[in-house]
Amino acid sequence: MHGRRHVLVGLILAADAALFPASVQADNFGRVRYDRQTDRLVVTMLYRGTNPGHTFSLKWGECQTGQSGGLPGVNAEVLDDQFNDPEEQDFQKSVRFSLKGMPCPRPATITLRTAPRFFYTLTIP
């Protein structure tokens, strides 16, 4: 019985390695902060590609009321204009996102998201 279980676990791990290579990365966040003077988010983006010239933008979701803490909240998807760029080198870039298009009244909670699973939440006064 134990032998079959070990074979099954080995097959699952081999299939996982074949379908999801270790080199697959996604855009992620380094430092994230709110700049009160310019009313912008300052985000250090960590990403892989063939060049450092990626451009990032925000796609706002709908404002959600009734969040924990009593503040309205919104999800903002961070989009990479070169999301299909082959992942050859590591890069980082400091990006400033304007909050003019934020659909929630302030103060509010913003959750930044990148595909497939990275997120960062902060409160904007």
Where on the chain are the PLM-derived regions?
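N-terminal export leaders
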Residues: 4-8
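Bacterial N-terminal signal peptides
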Residues: 10-18
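Short acidic/polar inter-strand loop motif in beta-rich domains
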Residues: 113-123
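The feature marks short-to-medium sequence segments in extracytoplasmic or secretory-pathway proteins
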Residues: 56-80
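Short, surface-exposed binding/anchoring microloops in extracellular/periplasmic proteins
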Residues: 27-64
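A short, structured loop/turn motif at beta-sheet edges
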Residues: 36-38, 51, 64-72, 101-106
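Short, solvent-exposed, Trp/other aromatic-anchored flexible loops in extracytoplasmic proteins
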Residues: 77-109
